[in-house]
From Swiss-Prot:
Residues 164-462 form the Protein kinase domain. Residues 64-155 are annotated as: Disordered. One of its GO terms (molecular function) is ATP binding. ATP binds at L170, T171, P172, G173, S174, E175, G176, R177, V178, K194. Coiled coil: none annotated. Residues 99-111 have a biased composition (Basic and acidic residues). This is Serine/threonine-protein kinase US3 homolog. It is an enzyme of class 2 (transferase). One of its GO terms (cellular component) is host cell nucleus. It comes from Bovine herpesvirus 1.2 (strain ST) (BoHV-1).
């Protein structure tokens, strides 16, 4: 706790708005057919945001992509949660420079992308110039180079050519550039632009075109400028991580349950369509208010997920499920675990349930320099942290001796806790019985015993919260 408080104080002293947890995994699938499909539409390089993106793209776009779909109205502003804009759908599935929450990846080729800087106030942003707004703490020298095959100047030129006025630059990722902008006259609507020469940018946009749910970010349009893909997304007041940073305290239980239910509703919708998000975290939960919540950033999404098997490594180290960290078989319930970590963070802020593995200079080392892609050993260290933090009993591991999670990690099981008993580390939250039970169910170690998102929505705690 003392180290976490000191780290938070240092971040605030430096004026950092960048998320601690914006890094995630991206692995390029072998034998991907995505590049060929996308080159025909936009002549973009064949790179995938996360392993499995090619299958997902082809599954939902068998007849090829359509461009510039009709604009869809984003959610209205709502009272209750204040703040600046948030990127609804910034690329994850990669590594953002300079952040503390780090990524894991395996032997596959990495295709890194990054999260956004947290937004500043609207009054500050509107005073910025068209060609380049304040970058916050982002280094202009680092920002000038290519990201996702496109330089800052190229991306800004494309935005202007498409009649968008840039308000603010957000942290670029290796899949492309991200901006807050106003759209063409007469509406001049505030939106978020994702501009890149990456096939995964188009694949994510084409996936979002097929989704229509109140708790899933809305795509407004997909535009092209030469070889560049421009996804136009809804703009939200803030993301959940920023909101927690600003209030600097745990959320009230009713509000946390309201947000948790919205996240589970979005996941239940995705899972009914056999899509796993694979990167649920506070940075990817966007809010206009506690009753207006959506999931964004589908750069790591995979589908169709039809049965438990290994679909590749993706996501964020601290929020990844045990089965994904072990590179074992998994299904859509991997998202339920991640949603449980998000729920804990809302209720325990600024405490984190699972800190990232210690870096070369120790846990307190400030993140600096270029991003780091983490490998199997980092995933293993993180999984050991999960096992030790929850004191997972041997009987709570998957029963099959051939399961990678059981085969490689059961020997590290704890002995000081009864199997299937409450996690001691959750007792400090002092939750009511129903809420405590919900959190324990979401954090069930063996995903085969973990409820689905749809099943959790029937939990009595949500009836009590809405009553």
């Amino acid at each position: 706790m003392e180290r976490a408080a000191e780290r938070l104080a240092r971040q605030r002293a430096r004026g950092l708005w960048r998320s601690r947890f914006a890094c995630c995994v991206a692995a390029e699938p072998s034998g991907s057919r995505l590049g060929q499909s996308v080159r025909g539409a936009a002549a973009a390089p064949a790179r995938c945001a996360a392993e499995g993106s090619a299958d997902l793209y082809l599954a939902v776009n068998n007849e090829g992509p359509e461009v510039a779909p009709p604009a869809r109205t984003g959610p209205p502003d709502a009272d209750g949660i204040e703040g600046g804009a948030a990127v609804a759908g910034n690329e994850q599935g990669g590594v953002a420079a300079g952040n503390e929450r780090r990524a894991a990846t395996g032997d596959e080729k990495e295709s890194a992308s990054g999260g956004e800087n947290e937004s500043e106030s609207e009054s500050e942003s509107e005073s910025e110039s068209e060609s380049g707004a304040d970058d916050g703490d982002w280094d202009d020298d680092d920002d000038a180079g290519p990201a996702g095959g496109v330089t800052r100047e190229e991306a800004e030129g494309a935005a202007r050519a498409l009649n968008f006025r840039i308000i603010r630059r957000l942290t670029p990722g290796s899949e492309g550039r991200v901006f807050e902008a106003t759209g063409p006259a007469p509406a001049q609507e505030h939106v978020v632009l994702k501009i890149g020469a990456s096939a995964s940018t188009l694949a994510e946009a084409m996936l979002l075109r097929t989704l229509d749910h109140a708790n899933v970010v809305k795509l407004k349009a997909v535009l092209f400028h030469g070889e560049l893909v421009c996804a136009v997304l809804a703009r939200y007041r803030e993301d959940l991580h920023t909101h927690l940073w600003k209030i600097d305290r745990p959320m009230a239980l009713p509000t946390a349950l309201q947000v948790t239910r919205a996240v589970l509703q979005g996941l239940a919708y995705l899972h009914s369509r056999r899509i796993a998000h694979r990167d649920v975290k506070t940075e990817n939960v966007f809010l206009n208010g506690p009753g207006d919540v959506c999931l964004g950033d589908f750069g790591a999404a995979h589908g169709p997920v039809t049965e438990p098997r290994y679909y590749g490594l993706a996501g964020t180290l601290e929020t990844n499920s045990p089965e994904l960290l072990a590179r074992a078989r998994y299904d859509c319930r991997t998202d339920v675990w991640s949603a449980g970590v998000v729920a804990y963070e809302m209720l325990a802020y600024p405490r984190a349930l699972f800190d990232s593995p210690a870096g070369p200079q120790g846990e307190d080392a400030e993140a600096s320099g270029p991003p780091t892609i983490l490998g199997d050993r980092d995933c293993a260290r993180q999984l050991l942290r999960v096992i030790r933090r929850l004191a997972v009993h041997a009987e709570e591991f998957p029963p099959s001796p051939t399961d990678r999670l059981t085969r490689n990690f059961k020997r590290h099981a704890a002995t000081g806790r009864e199997p299937h008993s409450p996690y001691r580390c959750l007792a400090v939250l002092r939750l009511p019985c129903d809420a405590d039970r919900l959190l324990h169910q979401m954090l069930t170690f063996d995903f085969r015993a973990r409820p689905t998102a749809a099943e959790l929505l029937e939990h009595p705690v949500f009836g009590a919260a809405s009553g």
